[in-house]
Amino acid sequence: MPLYPPGAAVMAPIAGHTDIPFRRMIRRFGCRHAFTEMIDAGSLVFQGQQTLRLAQRGSDAGFLGIQLVGSDLPTLKRAAELINGMDFDVLDFNLGCPAPKVARKCEGIRFALEDPDGAVRAFETLVSASRLPDRKSVV
């Protein structure tokens, strides 16, 4: 069974844009599947105020995913455990962001390209730590 129904509109995470007001607006135009902005796993674990704001659902009752970026296994594990206590439908692991501030930390696409085995271990860590209702919920 697919994660999203065929033909579904899915709003990808976009840093600086997919905040609560933006998600509310796209819902009015029929987008049923949305994500938070990309969230740094370390910032979530250390409870940064800006990060906690990004991770809020607000009054959004629709399908909502959270996207994490990171490369440190214990930090990713702890971030997934924190997400277990939040109300998200899916956890997305970012292995594609080319932004310099992400690549400098060997995260996103640089992590996937330079340490593919590490990226696999990171993904496995997230899957094993996640308690989302469906295992396909970690993508």
Identify what each model region corresponds to.
Residues 4-9:
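Extreme N-terminal starter segment of soluble prokaryotic enzymes
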Residues 13, 70, 77-80, 84-89, ...:
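Conserved alpha/beta-domain cores
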